[in-house]
């Protein structure tokens, strides 16, 4: 009887460890996804294009920024329509109409500015 209990306890411990490892792998893959922001080609994109999961650049007609929002960062309004031209880590390339590319980390802005 004690061996059955010990066996069941060991089985539950094994399942717990496996589920924790699987959950940690899921969290790691999601964080890697956010580290690589420019996966879906881009630029200014009047009707599509753009950065960050298919959004449309600076937002002419089709939105922009993150996940299809209007400017940069979830729903801001891009150029025509106000709002949204903020770069979390600073602007790494300024074009004719303002910031064309946001920096992916804070140190990149410092490196870019020292080159000018």
Swiss-Prot record:
Major site of localization recorded for this protein: secreted
5 X 6 AA tandem repeats of G-G-G-G-[HYRS]-[GYQ]: annotated segments: 54-86
Cell compartment(s), UniProt: Secreted, Extracellular space, Extracellular matrix
Alphabetical list of InterPro entries matching this protein: GRP
Biased composition (Basic and acidic residues): 29-39
The protein's assembly and partners: Interacts with WAK1 (via the extracellular domain). Component of a 500 kDa complex, composed of GRP3 or GRP3-S, WAK1 and KAPP.
Function, as annotated: Regulates the function of the receptor protein kinase WAK1.
Official protein name in the record: Glycine-rich protein 3 short isoform
